[in-house]
Amino acid sequence: FMLFVFYPLLLRVFGVKIGYRKFFRGLSPAQFLAFSTSSSAATLPVTIECVNNNLKVPEKATDFVLPIGATVNMDGTSLYQAVAVIFLAQYHDVDLSMMQQLGIVATATLASIGAAAVPSAGLIMLMIVLDSVGLNPMWIALVLPVDRINVTSDAAVSAIIAKSEKMMD
């Protein structure tokens, strides 16, 4: 949902004129690299190249926004952690109270902000989130194979910043 609906919609709301297909086609090399390396930081040079050359976002915007996004913008990590913890609780027939669910959201959000932009840092943070609500941290073994992506939001924000600063149409 976030990848294919929210970010393209966000671009439209802020008036960025990059078509849906052009956005994903232009960003696909960075997305594939992000998926294979599992690291926003490792993907940064390719993301910058894709956003500058394929999406035509000025370098001034991408050189400022993308490095910050690679280290701070961990929305994928936050969503992944919250969904993974709730999935693991349901898988193990653990009923979570509303307070526990709110605690999961709060802890996942804070943990994602503090997560390093290195491969699989989110898994370590996931153990902390699981432990914070009294669940077994070793349950991460079930979700280990599906850990990944934040690059798309970094590119979308870069285009929005360039548009708001009147650097692009």
Regions found by a protein language model. Give the residues of each.
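Membrane-helix boundary/coupling elements in multi-pass transport proteins
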Residues: 35-50, 57-60, 76-82, 115-122, ...
